[in-house]
Curated annotation (Swiss-Prot):
GO terms for molecular function: tetrahydromethanopterin S-methyltransferase activity. It comes from Methanosarcina acetivorans (strain ATCC 35395 / DSM 2834 / JCM 12185 / C2A). Pathway: One-carbon metabolism; methanogenesis from CO(2); methyl-coenzyme M from 5,10-methylene-5,6,7,8-tetrahydromethanopterin: step 2/2. Part of a complex that catalyzes the formation of methyl-coenzyme M and tetrahydromethanopterin from coenzyme M and methyl-tetrahydromethanopterin. This is an energy-conserving, sodium-ion translocating step. The complex is composed of 8 subunits; MtrA, MtrB, MtrC, MtrD, MtrE, MtrF, MtrG and MtrH. The chain crosses the membrane at residues 9-29, 47-67, 75-95, 138-158, 183-203, 224-244. The gene is mtrD. This is Tetrahydromethanopterin S-methyltransferase subunit D.
Length: 249
């Protein structure tokens, strides 16, 4: 057991880094929850975990497809990042269409007087009794950054788990040689599990809604990152030991 951990110490570290990136990324995603679904809060009208998982798991799938072509880590991470960024961007764009053309409200933030990016006035367009609505430019940019970090984190976790399996002798050759192998399934299950753990922890930190990096709640991210660091260590140890032991079957 100790030998398995020491033999995969590099991948163990990469899994932990990936988990921390996932946790940090959640704080960038504009989450509006139920109030946003009724256009009474800025952000996307669903929960933290759903948005983070949707973007991050898309990045994980993108990384998996890239591993069919190459085992180059930077390219795999880039693929994961782009996949997650596209996913969250499309979600925010479609949400904005609904808010603007369906509900008929102007995307605006109640957390700041001026949009930090466009410098447009915000408070004049916030409807009375609401905490903003829609997705102003700063929230959109923040969400894309969140997708970038989450995609890289998810891809890094998945790639590392695949390499742990290869080290254990579950397959030979490069990562592209594991397509269709049982290793893909077991690595994906552990990667998804680690992703959800690190998506849930920031939810307690955020406590409902967050507009992006301009929201005062964003400054709480160090607490969630530290908690996710500890949680990911435990998850990584279990995952590495479990996958390593499969090499003897």
């Amino acid at each position: 057991m100790i030998d398995a951990l020491m033999a995969n110490i590099l991948w163990l570290v990469f899994i932990i880094i990936g988990g921390v990136l996932i946790s940090w990324s959640v704080h960038f995603v504009p989450v509006g929850g139920a109030p946003a679904a009724m256009a009474q809060a800025t952000g996307i009208g669903t929960g933290t975990v759903q948005l983070a998982a949707g973007a991050g798991l898309t990045g994980l799938v993108s990384a998996g497809f890239m591993m069919n072509v190459t085992d180059n880590l930077p390219l795999i991470l880039a693929s994961g990042a782009v996949g997650a960024m596209i996913m969250i961007s499309v979600t925010m764009i479609v949400g904005t269409w609904v808010y603007v053309y369906g509900v008929g409200c102007v995307p605006s933030s109640a957390k700041v007087k001026y949009d930090p990016i466009t410098k447009y006035r915000q408070d004049l367009y916030v409807s009375q009794g609401t905490e903003g609505h829609g997705l102003p430019t700063v929230s959109f940019v923040s969400g894309v950054i969140g997708g970038l970090l989450g995609g890289i984190g998810g891809a890094l976790v998945y790639y590392s788990l695949i390499e742990v399996g290869l080290t254990a002798g579950l397959s030979t050759g490069t990562s592209s040689g594991v397509t269709g192998h049982e290793l893909v399934g077991i690595a994906a299950m552990f990667a998804i599990g680690i992703f959800f753990v690190n998506a849930v922890i920031p939810s307690y930190n955020i406590g409902g809604t967050i507009e992006g990096f301009h929201d005062p709640k964003w400054k709480k991210w160090p607490k969630a990152v530290i908690s996710s660091f500890v949680a990911t260590i435990l998850c990584a140890i279990v995952a590495v030991i479990a996958i390593s032991q499969l090499g003897g079957i």
